[in-house]
Regions:
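Conserved acyl-donor/pantetheine-binding loop and adjacent beta-alpha core of acyl/acetyltransferases
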Residues: 90-126, 132, 179-187
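A short beta-loop-alpha structural element at the N-terminal edge
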Residues: 38-51
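N-terminal, intrinsically disordered charge-dense segments
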Residues: 22, 30-35
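Conserved GNAT acetyl-CoA-binding A-motif
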Residues: 141, 146-160
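Conserved acetyl-CoA-binding loop-helix of GNAT-fold acetyltransferases
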Residues: 127, 133-146
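Conserved catalytic-core motifs of GNAT/GCN5-like acyltransferases
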Residues: 98, 157-159, 169, 174-190
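Active-site rim helix/loop that mediates acceptor-substrate recognition in acyltransferases
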Residues: 60-87, 91, 95-112
C-alpha cells in the first residue's frame, strides 16, 4: 500500500495549538518554526507496531486486542482509520468501519463478513498518556466526521469503555439504553451520534 501523506480531506496538516485555533496560519507557522511536524494520516502497514505499543499503554481495564483483530477493521475500511503523527511518531490512532446493526461487534474476534451498512462503528480511539489533554482525540474525531459525511454514513456508533462516557458526550454522542456484551468491560456504554445530511 502506498504511503498516504494525508487522508485527503484536510486542507492543511494538523498543527499544535499555539495561542489560537489550529486553523490559524500564524499558529501553524509558529509551530512549524519550533520544529513541530504534525499530521493526521491513513494507517499503513509500517504503523502497526506503534499502534500495538500504544494500545498496550492505554487499555488497563479492557484486554488489548490482537494485531489480526485490529487489522480486520482497517482492511475492511482503510479510509476511516487514521493515526496522528508528531515528528513521525504515532501519538494517537482511530479505527472505524462500516456496520449494519446496533449490536456492536464482539471484541477479540475479526470482523464477520457482510458488515456493510449505513452505520460507521468507531471501534477504537487511543492517545498516548503523555499526550493527554492536547486535543489529539478531538482532531481524530473531527477527521472521522468529515470522512463519514463524505461517504454518506447516517450515524456513528461506539462503545465507551474505561469511564469515557463524559468525553464522548462532549463530542456529540448520546448514550443508548441497550446492554453491550460483557467483553467490553464493566460500565461499558453504547453511544450514538446521528450525522446530519
Amino acid at each position: 500500500m502506498a504511503f498516504l501523506p494525508c487522508v485527503g480531506f484536510c486542507d492543511y496538516d494538523v498543527m499544535r495549538k499555539v495561542g489560537s485555533c489550529v486553523g490559524c496560519p500564524l499558529s501553524r507557522r509558529y509551530a512549524t518554526s519550533l520544529g513541530y511536524k504534525m499530521s493526521i494520516q491513513g494507517i499503513v502497514s509500517s504503523t502497526w507496531s506503534d499502534i500495538l505499543q500504544l494500545q498496550q499503554g492505554v487499555y488497563l481495564s479492557v484486554e488489548p486486542e490482537s494485531l489480526e483483530v485490529l487489522q480486520s477493521k482497517w482492511l475492511r475500511s482503510p479510509e476511516t482509520c487514521f493515526v496522528f503523527n508528531e515528528d513521525s511518531q504515532v501519538m494517537g490512532y482511530l479505527l472505524a468501519h462500516s456496520w449494519n446493526t446496533e449490536i456492536p461487534p464482539k471484541l477479540f474476534k475479526p470482523l464477520p463478513s457482510n458488515t456493510e451498512g449505513s452505520i460507521l462503528f468507531l471501534h477504537d480511539l487511543a492517545v498516548r498518556k503523555s499526550e493527554s489533554g492536547k486535543g489529539i482525540g478531538k482532531k481524530l474525531i473531527a477527521q472521522l466526521l468529515k470522512t463519514a459525511h463524505l461517504q454518506g454514513y447516517e450515524q456513528i456508533l461506539l462503545v465507551a469503555v474505561q469511564n469515557s462516557v463524559n468525553f464522548w458526550k462532549k463530542q456529540g454522542f448520546i448514550p443508548l439504553n441497550q446492554k453491550v456484551n460483557e467483553c467490553y468491560g464493566e460500565g461499558a456504554q453504547l453511544m450514538r451520534r446521528v450525522l446530519v445530511a
